Amino acid sequence: MRHRKSGRQLNRNSSHRKAMFSNMASSLVRHEVIKTTLPKAKELRRVVEPLITLAKTDSVANRRLAFARTRDNEVVAKLFNELGPRFAARQGGYTRILKAGFRAGDKAPMAYIELVDRPAAEEAAAE
């Protein structure tokens, strides 16, 4: 029985899931918007939001925790130097999921997951 077990399995074993979400979190931090399936996007929120909350207070310990989850120094630097200060006043809700139809090959529901208040989106809206 799987009572009270949270999180989606996504037909992967635990190490594959952990690696996949680490890679996806790094991609989301690096590009600020990625396209993926809807269930993966919903689950990715549970990985990325705590990382950004961690980045709001800059310390060596927090940087090491972020590195342990992402294994990428470039991503850790962007988290603490750009995203932490950008979301300092926001109490959670750092990501937005936009549904993007269905994939042609297998009709999987697709979605964009993006960071809210990203500069590229603000520039496009101003034009």
Curated annotation (Swiss-Prot):
The keyword Ribosomal protein applies. Keywords: Ribonucleoprotein, Ribosomal protein. It comes from Vibrio vulnificus (strain YJ016). Gene3D superfamilies: Ribosomal protein L17. One of its GO terms (cellular component) is cytosolic large ribosomal subunit. Part of the 50S ribosomal subunit. Contacts protein L32. Belongs to the bacterial ribosomal protein bL17 family. GO terms for biological process: translation. The lineage of its organism: Bacteria, Pseudomonadati, Pseudomonadota, Gammaproteobacteria, Vibrionales. The gene is rplQ. Coiled coil: none annotated. This is Large ribosomal subunit protein bL17. GO terms for molecular function: structural constituent of ribosome. PROSITE patterns: RIBOSOMAL_L17 (PS01167). The keyword Lyase does not apply.
